[in-house]
């Protein structure tokens, strides 16, 4: 699943995950 590592998408996903987890 790491054929095309989109750092932008990954960063946004991580940020959203942390945001939701922090809530």
Swiss-Prot record:
Family to which this protein belongs: Belongs to the PqqA family.
Keywords annotated in UniProt: PQQ biosynthesis
InterPro entries: PQQ_synth_PqqA
Species: Stutzerimonas stutzeri (Pseudomonas stutzeri)
Pathway(s): Cofactor biosynthesis; pyrroloquinoline quinone biosynthesis
Pfam families in UniProt: PqqA (PF08042)
Function: Required for coenzyme pyrroloquinoline quinone (PQQ) biosynthesis. PQQ is probably formed by cross-linking a specific glutamate to a specific tyrosine residue and excising these residues from the peptide.
Covalent link Pyrroloquinoline quinone (Glu-Tyr), residues: 15-19
Keyword hit for Nucleus: no
Gene Ontology BP terms: pyrroloquinoline quinone biosynthetic process
Domain of life: Bacteria
Stated name of the protein: Coenzyme PQQ synthesis protein A
């Amino acid at each position: 699943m790491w054929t095309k590592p989109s750092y932008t998408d990954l960063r946004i996903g991580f940020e959203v995950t942390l945001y939701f987890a922090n809530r």
